[in-house]
Amino acid sequence: MSHEKSFLVSGDNYPPPNPGYPGGPQPPMPPYAQPPYPGAPYPQPPFQPSPYGQPGYPHGPSPYPQGGYPQGPYPQGGYPQGPYPQEGYPQGPYPQGGYPQGPYPQSPFPPNPYGQPQVFPGQDPDSPQHGNYQEEGPPSYYDNQDFPATNWDDKSIRQAFIRKVFLVLTLQLSVTLSTVSVFTFVAEVKGFVRENVWTYYVSYAVFFISLIVLSCCGDFRRKHPWNLVALSVLTASLSYMVGMIASFYNTEAVIMAVGITTAVCFTVVIFSMQTRYDFTSCMGVLLVSMVVLFIFAILCIFIRNRILEIVYASLGALLFTCFLAVDTQLLLGNKQLSLSPEEYVFAALNLYTDIINIFLYILTIIGRAKE
C-alpha cells in the first residue's frame, strides 16, 4: 500500500525526519494501525494515485473521519506525531510544527498541539520555511534607522539657500562699507552732505518705500529680477543714509563702531548656528520689545539727554542683536520657524537691516560717550 498518509506537503519542502522502514514485521503505530509495508522507500511522492484501497482504522472509534482517501488533488492535514518510541526509529520526541497557512483548503483536523517546527542542522530557525507566513512579510524601511526619513535633496536646497543669502548679504555690506568709507575719509563729500541735509530725507523716503514693498508684497519679492532691483535700491538708499550719519561723527568713532559691529555680528551668527536653543520661539517677545523701544525713541526726541540716549542706544543694540540671532536661525530650517528657500531676498534683507541697526546704535554709544 502507498504510504500516502505519512506526511502532508503544503509548502514544506523537507522530507519527514523518520528513516525508511526495515524489512520484516512492522509494529503498529498507536493509536492508528498501519498495514505493514516492508521496505517502503521514504520520502513518498505526495498524492500519487495508488492501486490499493485504503482500509479503515481497525482499532476502535476515532475522532477523525475514517476511510480511504479520495483520488484527487485535495491536500490532507498533517497528523501530530507524539513522542512514541518506535522500533527502528531514534528514541526521542519528534515535535511536529503546524503547517503554514497558505491559500489552500485546510484540513478539518485540529491544529498540532506540539511546539516549534523541526529545524534541521545548518538551517536558520527564523527562515520562512519554519516561520509563520501570516505574521511575516517584506521588511519595512519606513521605521528602519538605516533608512532615515531625511531628504537629501531638501538638505542640498537648504544649503544652497544659505549660501545665496550670505552672498547677497556680503555684496550689500560691501556697498555700505564703501559708502561709509567715502563719507568718512573724503572731506569734500563730508562737507557736501552736511550742507545738503535734504538728501537724507529723500534717501529715507526711497528706503522706506522699498522696505514696505519687499516686506509686504510676497509675490513681488519672489519675482526675479525685480526683487533684486528693489533690494539694490534699498541697499543704495540705506548706504547713503548710514554714510551721511557717519559723516557727523569722528573718524575714530566710526572705525571703532565698524570693528565692534563686525565682532558682535560674527559671534552671534556662529553661536546661532551652533546652539540648540531655538531663538525663533522668542519672536513674540522681541516684537513687543520693539514696540517699547519705539516709544522710548519718541521720548528721546523730546527729552534731549546724553545719558538717556546712551541707554536707548544700548537697548537698541541688544534688541537687534537678538533679532540677528533669530533671523540667522530662520535660515537653517530646523527650528520652530523657518524661511522658504524662495525667500532669499527677504532673508538677506532681514540680516542686512539687523547689522546696519547694530552699527548705528554702537556708533551712537561711542559718539555720545566721547562728548
Swiss-Prot record:
CDD domains: LFG_like (cd10428). GO terms for molecular function: calcium channel activity; transmembrane transporter binding. GO terms for biological process: apoptotic signaling pathway; endoplasmic reticulum calcium ion homeostasis; negative regulation of endoplasmic reticulum stress-induced intrinsic apoptotic signaling pathway; negative regulation of extrinsic apoptotic signaling pathway via death domain receptors; negative regulation of neuron apoptotic process. The gene is GRINA. It comes from the Eukaryota. Keywords: Membrane, Transmembrane, Transmembrane helix. Belongs to the BI1 family. LFG subfamily. Residues 84-98 have a biased composition (Low complexity). InterPro entries: Bax_inhibitor_1-related. One of its GO terms (cellular component) is Golgi apparatus. The keyword Chloroplast does not apply. This is Protein lifeguard 1. It is a multi-pass membrane protein. It comes from Homo sapiens (Human). Residues 1-145 are annotated as: Disordered. Potential apoptotic regulator. The lineage of its organism: Eukaryota, Metazoa, Chordata, Craniata, Vertebrata. It is found in: Membrane. The chain crosses the membrane at residues 165-185, 197-217, 228-248, 253-273, 283-303, 307-327, 346-366. Residues 14-49, 102-114 have a biased composition (Pro residues).
